[in-house]
Design a protein with these regions (language model features):
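S-adenosyl-L-methionine
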Residues: 3-38
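A conserved structural/catalytic subdomain of Rossmann-like adenosyl-cofactor enzymes
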Residues: 37, 41-431
Length: 434
């Protein structure tokens, strides 16, 4: 790390978290305190993007940076007689590639632009591909970092790979929103992406184990939710009867269905074995198909209940009973969402890899041959290989309405703020003008 203050912070971070590390102050481009060439089994890195003031003369003879070629197109002069590299992206890529042992592996975060960079950088990329260093490329969603808004890609190196194909994964549509401006991967999304690579390596057991863990989590929540559903159903039925609703929704079929599903899971769980992958996968697909109608019926039931409660609320808006019931229904919706969460991940996996085997999936992943990569001028942009598919957002009608109302509230607030600013600006201009 080149900045002393950051070195101190990093050392403090290591100390307070009980980690080990050897952090030194130096400028990586010009110094090599770790003697890194061919030294490391693993490298994980998130270097700065697009550094444009690296002195070309100081790095072009360094084997850490020139083994696969030096970026030198469109070099510019910062000081008289000092030629600089166009940017440092491919210096970092070179550094991490040359730091690996013969069977070493690396993962690094890099600006999206590096995947398609042209001229000398394209030649470096071609050299890396032809030397079979690159295992895979993964496009990240935007707004994944708090301080960097640029879209980024993960590069994976594996010097021990024997297959010359490259795995491309486009994960830009896989994310969990934190707020309007920031996103993250949930733990389940990380596992779903990782299992693509494991399937590519023919590790099918990890796939059925992951699906099995989702079933365990989902059904444990369904068991708890089933009890809540019984309690709320009694209150809803009594409430609607009190207000003389003619067609009171019947909760019994859904409650019975939940009980049947739990019994089916217990039977599946008792016989589950990851050793027999094809049999386990077949049983998992069958179990998931039984779950889908349950949630469809449940959502339809709750939609009907919400509609009836809204009609009653129009004429009795101040009723404490209605407010209390609405609170319980909101809690019920939250529990449904939490319960359905793990089953949604099961559906996501089974829709794309129904046989528990790797397969190219349009819009998600592609195992590209060297000839296919040559056709794309050695681009490493996953979007060029995986294709595009238009997917539905997966929201229920209630979730869509809730999101629209939330966005409308935000727009109303922004419009009010804009009017205040407009008045303030007008007032200030008049004050200045006298």
């Amino acid at each position: 790390e080149k900045t002393l203050e950051t070195v101190k912070l990093a050392k403090m971070n290591i100390a307070v978290n009980g980690l080990r590390g050897d952090i030194k102050q130096s400028i990586t481009y010009y110094e090599d305190p770790h003697e890194s060439f061919g030294k490391f089994d693993y490298v994980l890195a998130n270097p700065p993007f697009n550094v444009d003031d690296v002195n070309l003369g100081k790095v072009e003879q360094d084997k850490r940076f020139n083994t696969y070629g030096i970026p030198r197109n469109k070099s510019k002069t910062k000081k008289k007689g000092e030629e600089t590299c166009p940017n440092g992206n491919y210096l970092w890529i070179n550094l991490f590639a040359t730091s690996l042992k013969e069977d070493g592996r690396a993962a690094l975060v890099m600006a999206n632009s590096a995947s398609d960079a042209r001229h000398s950088e394209a030649n470096i990329r071609k050299s890396l591909i032809e030397n079979n260093l690159i295992y895979g490329m993964l496009t990240l969603p935007s707004n994944m970092f708090y301080t960097v808004t640029l879209p980024a890609t993960l590069w994976f190196f594996d010097k021990a790979k024997t297959d010359d194909r490259i795995l491309f994964i486009d994960a830009k549509n896989i994310f969990t929103p934190i707020d309007r401006a920031h996103r993250e991967f949930s733990e389940e999304q990380v596992q779903n992406i990782a299992v693509i690579s494991r399937l590519h390596k023919d590790n099918r057991e990890s796939y059925v184990e992951l699906v099995h863990s989702y079933f365990q989590n989902g059904f444990s929540r369904l068991k708890v939710y089933g009890s809540s559903l019984k309690d709320v159903s009694k209150k809803v039925t009594g409430f609607l009867a009190e207000y003389k609703v003619k067609n009171i929704p019947n909760f019994s079929p859904v409650i019975d269905s939940a009980k049947t599903l739990l019994e089916g899971f217990q039977k599946y769980d008792k016989n589950y074995s990851a050793d027999n992958i094809d049999k386990s996968n077949k049983e998992q697909v069958k179990l998931a198909l039984n779950v889908k109608p349950f949630f469809e019926a449940l959502h339809q039931l709750l939609k009907t209940v919400d509609k009836e409660v809204r009609h009653i609320e129009k004429d009795n808006s101040g009723s404490k009973d209605i407010k209390a019931l609405k609170t319980e229904l909101e809690e019920l919706h939250r529990e449904v969402k939490e319960t359905e969460y793990f089953f949604a991940h099961i559906n996501w996996l089974q829709d794309r890899f129904p046989d528990a085997r790797y397969d190219d999936v349009t819009g998600l992943c592609k195992l590209a041959t060297i000839d296919e990569i040559k056709e794309q001028d050695y681009s490493l942009n996953p979007g060029r290989y995986v294709g595009v598919v238009i997917e539905e957002d997966g929201k229920t009608e209630e979730e869509f309405i809730e999101e629209m109302l939330s966005m409308n509230d935000e727009l109303t607030k922004l419009n009010a703020d804009a009017q205040k600013l407009e008045s303030t600006i007008t007032h200030n201009i008049k004050q200045i003008a006298g």
